[in-house]
Amino acid sequence: NIESLNMDEKIYPMWFQIMVFVNFLIGFVIRVPFVPFHNWYPDIQSKAAAPVNILLAGMLLNTGVYGLIRFNMQVFPAIFKLFAPVLMVWGIVNIIYSGALSIVQSGIKKMVAYANVSSMGFVMVGLACLNPTGFNGAVFMSIACAVVYSAFFVIISCVQFRTKTTYITALGGLGKVMPKCMYLALIICFSAIGVPFLMMFTPKLMVLSGAMLSNLEQQLTVKIAAIIGLAAIVVSAGYIMYFFYKVFCSVLLEQWKKIKDLSPQETGVLSALCLIIIYFGVYPMSIIQIYQSVSSIIIDVLQV
C-alpha cells in the first residue's frame, strides 16, 4: 500500500528520507534515462534489432517515469518538493546536453536515441513544476515519446532493411523511391519537433506553461528554465528536420534507385502509429482525462 509507505518526518529522520529518496531517484533516472546516466541507451539502440529498438523506446523508458511518480513523488512528497528546483534544472540540462549530442551523430539510430533522451527531459521539468498543468504535461509527454519514437524506429528499420546502413551520410533522396515512407516519416518528424495538432505539441506546451505557473521559491530559475526549454524545441527542430532532408529529400544516390517502397504490412503499422499521433494531437483531452483525477490527488499532497 503506497499510502502506508508515505515517509513521515515525525517517524523517519530527514537524513534517512533523503538517502532513500536519492537511491530511488538514481535507480529510476538510469532507467528513463537522464544525463549523466544515459550512455547505455544510445549504445544499445544503435546495435539492437528493430523489435528491441521499439520495445526500449515504447515501454522501458516509461517504467522509469512510473517509478519516479509512484515512489519518489508519492512515498517522499516532502523530499520531492525540496528537490524540485534541482530536478527542474536537471531536466533542462538533459534537454540541452542530449540535444547537442544528437546533432553530432552520424548514425540515425543514435541520433534518434539522443533525441528521445532529450525529449524525456521535459518529463522531469513537468514533474518538478508541482502543479497540475506541469504534471499532466509530463505524463502526456511520456506517453507521446513512447508512440513517436517507436514510430521513428519503425521508419529506421524499414530504411535499414533496404539499404543495410543507418549512416546519414550514406543515405539520400529516398523519398523519390519511397514516397509512402517519406510522407509517414514527415508526420513523425513534425510531431517530434512539436508541430500543433500532433501528439507532442500539447505536452510540451503544458510543461512549459506549468513551469511559468510554478510556485517554486526560485522563481527566476524556473522562468529561465522555461525559456531555455522553449529554445531547445527550436534547436531540436533543426536536427530532426536535417535528418528528414538528408535521408528523404536530398539527391538520390545511384545505389538506392532500385529499392522498393514500404510493403502493405509496414504501411499499415506506420499508418496506425501516425493516426494515433494525429488523433491525440487534435484531441489531447481524450488521454489526459484518463489520469487527470489521479494527478490532482498527487499534486494536492505535494502542495500541502
Task: Describe each PLM feature range.
Residues 1-205, 209-241:
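Hydrophobic transmembrane alpha-helices and their helix-loop junctions in integral membrane proteins
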Residues 176-180, 240-304:
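Cytoplasmic/organellar membrane-interface segments at the starts of transmembrane helices
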